[in-house]
């Protein structure tokens, strides 16, 4: 008798995606982050659902409803901090996943890559509107500063900002709609993730060498299911350690002060995972220029497949490209540090140099080095 998992219409889909899926035998732990992102998404949706049961999206009660969750709801503090730190784990996995794609040339699967960039933008939007919900000082001022950037768009800017705010400032209407967005977006992310997987399974996974591995495939289960379970346990362990020992390590103390439109915090800054983009935004002394640089810092990922000049897909056998890749990582860490610093000397000039280097590496240096490596190999 044929196995039910191979014949049942629904089981067949799951079987082909997670059980009998032919997978390259050589993929390393860098390929774990896809499944970890799926786990993060499930955890965020579940903790978020329980938080939404007790949260009130109203300016007069939002802050106290979060305090109520932490004080009065059974394990409410735990759910709240799991959700807040879960977002940080989500972005750590996301950046590692993108870094893996850049290093091993996974971006050559163009449909999968483009859906991935769309997923990144959607996750960033979700995190941004979510950060506004506790209605602390940084929530309010973060929302004001970031939405205000749209006013840099010529002609329609001001109208657009007021339309998003639902009034002439960030207020009740803004909070309500941001809650609605924060609730719906994770489900859009889930749908996009399914499409991401669909396109990936059309081509099969890449591997560290970047060479087609059709002649050396193994079934996903049990080999990679057990490997993914190990990754999941490490992720959960890290998240629990963060949540139970230092829940506020990655947060901002200003967000424990209720939102006050009459008092501006000394340093307005987003959560750590947006600091690199915030540093690029601040490094240009022009509003529209800064907004364009901010957008381009993320959207540049779309152009990476077009900037591939090397005849080798992966960086595994390309030491010069590896050097530039790790320089890019160091540059992004520098930008992250600068984004959290006040706007004064020497941080301004360091931020500007790091921003220039970021675009220079991706648009000029990496493609050029790819060509040089081809020459060295006489290709």
Swiss-Prot record:
> Could you tell me which cysteines form disulfide bridges?
none
Name the coenzymes or cofactors required: heme b
Instruction: State one molecular function term (GO).
Output: ubiquinol-cytochrome-c reductase activity
Which CDD domains does the UniProt entry name for this protein? Answer: cytochrome_b_C (cd00290), Cytochrome_b_N (cd00284)
Annotated residues for binding of heme b b562? 83, 182
Subunit composition and interactions: The cytochrome bc1 complex contains 11 subunits: 3 respiratory subunits (MT-CYB, CYC1 and UQCRFS1), 2 core proteins (UQCRC1 and UQCRC2) and 6 low-molecular weight proteins (UQCRH/QCR6, UQCRB/QCR7, UQCRQ/QCR8, UQCR10/QCR9, UQCR11/QCR10 and a cleavage product of UQCRFS1). This cytochrome bc1 complex then forms a dimer.
Q: Which PANTHER family match?
A: CYTOCHROME B (PTHR19271:SF16)
> What is the protein name stated in its UniProt record?
Cytochrome b
Q: Which organism is it from?
A: Sotalia guianensis
Q: Which gene encodes it?
A: MT-CYB
